[in-house]
């Protein structure tokens, strides 16, 4: 689940609340993060087979709930209610086509041929969180939709490739932005990656745009998400009346991919690889 950029003026409320201070995780804590991260990745693998025309987003949500229970985990998003926001009613986020993020599962929302859908899962297991998302193609999609989805995944991986001790947070965003814009797409500014561990969101913010050499210097033990959202058109957003759903201002397509990563002595480890 995304973190709203504190520098954004889109809304007055900070979304969501965060713990204070930079968090560096120990080797023991990282073992727990690996376990929950792998579980989150496995959940997306499981749900992928259900992504087809005629399936409701509520059905995806219900299956995710059952699967988490079977594996001893719980959803970190279900009932999540930052100050000023209604409780989130989904165990997962399901964001279709122009929905950028935080789409709420609904029995009346049925997948159609040609859709793209991002499924974002945040699990809690043994007190730690695993957060990952992928955008899936539903049936036969347009060339533009396919290009957008592929560019979004590649931009995420290019950002992750920048991560190592001594690198700057801005290096991640600069790599993502350069690839996205060269591919003809825009990068969402108002939603950013975030620190994660015992809390779903910590103080650390990871913008998916920016300048090389800027921002906080990366250190071993830092754990955070890299989760770019690329839009077919403008990067500007609109927040719907439900208090959660975010869509593109021009109603054009949006895609997102997300991994949870840790800075290691040698570089980076992806904790949510399938």
From Swiss-Prot:
<comment type="function">
    <text>Removes the N-terminal methionine from nascent proteins. The N-terminal methionine is often cleaved when the second residue in the primary sequence is small and uncharged (Met-Ala-, Cys, Gly, Pro, Ser, Thr, or Val). Requires deformylation of the N(alpha)-formylated initiator methionine before it can be hydrolyzed.</text>
</comment>
<keyword id="KW-0031">Aminopeptidase</keyword>
<feature type="binding site">
    <location>
        <position position="258"/>
    </location>
    <ligand>
        <name>a divalent metal cation 1</name>
    </ligand>
</feature>
<keyword id="KW-0479">Metal-binding</keyword>
<dbReference type="GO" id="GO:0046872">
    <property type="term" value="F:metal ion binding"/>
</dbReference>
<dbReference type="GO" id="GO:0005829">
    <property type="term" value="C:cytosol"/>
</dbReference>
<dbReference type="InterPro" id="IPR001714">
    <property type="entry name" value="Pept_M24_MAP"/>
</dbReference>
<keyword id="KW-0378">Hydrolase</keyword>
<dbReference type="GO" id="GO:0006508">
    <property type="term" value="P:proteolysis"/>
</dbReference>
<protein>
    <recommendedName>
        <fullName>Methionine aminopeptidase B</fullName>
        <ecNumber>3.4.11.18</ecNumber>
    </recommendedName>
</protein>
<feature type="binding site">
    <location>
        <position position="194"/>
    </location>
    <ligand>
        <name>a divalent metal cation 2</name>
    </ligand>
</feature>
<comment type="similarity">
    <text>Belongs to the peptidase M24A family. Methionine aminopeptidase type 1 subfamily.</text>
</comment>
<feature type="binding site">
    <location>
        <position position="258"/>
    </location>
    <ligand>
        <name>a divalent metal cation 2</name>
    </ligand>
</feature>
<feature type="binding site">
    <location>
        <position position="131"/>
    </location>
    <ligand>
        <name>a divalent metal cation 1</name>
    </ligand>
</feature>
<feature type="binding site">
    <location>
        <position position="102"/>
    </location>
    <ligand>
        <name>substrate</name>
    </ligand>
</feature>
<feature type="binding site">
    <location>
        <position position="227"/>
    </location>
    <ligand>
        <name>a divalent metal cation 2</name>
    </ligand>
</feature>
<dbReference type="GO" id="GO:0004239">
    <property type="term" value="F:initiator methionyl aminopeptidase activity"/>
</dbReference>
<feature type="binding site">
    <location>
        <position position="131"/>
    </location>
    <ligand>
        <name>a divalent metal cation 2</name>
    </ligand>
</feature>
<keyword id="KW-0645">Protease</keyword>
<dbReference type="InterPro" id="IPR002467">
    <property type="entry name" value="Pept_M24A_MAP1"/>
</dbReference>
<dbReference type="InterPro" id="IPR036005">
    <property type="entry name" value="Creatinase/aminopeptidase-like"/>
</dbReference>
<comment type="subunit">
    <text>Monomer.</text>
</comment>
<feature type="binding site">
    <location>
        <position position="201"/>
    </location>
    <ligand>
        <name>substrate</name>
    </ligand>
</feature>
<dbReference type="Pfam" id="PF00557">
    <property type="entry name" value="Peptidase_M24"/>
</dbReference>
<feature type="binding site">
    <location>
        <position position="120"/>
    </location>
    <ligand>
        <name>a divalent metal cation 1</name>
    </ligand>
</feature>
<dbReference type="GO" id="GO:0070006">
    <property type="term" value="F:metalloaminopeptidase activity"/>
</dbReference>
<dbReference type="InterPro" id="IPR000994">
    <property type="entry name" value="Pept_M24"/>
</dbReference>
